Amino acid sequence: MIPVNSPETAVREFFKTFNEGNIEAILAFYEPKAAFVAQPGQVAEGTAALRAAVNGFLSLKPTLTMGPYQLVVAGDIALSVAKWTLQGTGPDGKAVQMEGATTDVLRRQVDGRWLFVIDNPWGVGLLG
């Protein structure tokens, strides 16, 4: 993993790393107590819960593509909003396609890395 010393790099590298399917590398993008919205109304908090939630997506052998995105940075906090599509294969062998607009919060760490604190891939879509 390349150093994620800017929120833009963190977001782009996260998408790339997700497609590689390495759960440990993916989890390295999150703070230990981060929250991940696995589906609307279901929030996974902390590394163990994130591992289970992300593994659910990885079981689809997905390809995750990032569309247009916007970053807003205020000091050590960043808000990222990005469109995404995911294509994979369900347990029944049928094609699966999902799309959404993620709303994420990242925080600069003491060592300069930017990590996800909140990852809500359904964020913008929840507003209707």
Task: List where the protein language model places each region.
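A beta-strand edge to alpha-helix "cap/lid" segment located at domain peripheries
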Residues: 1-25, 35-128
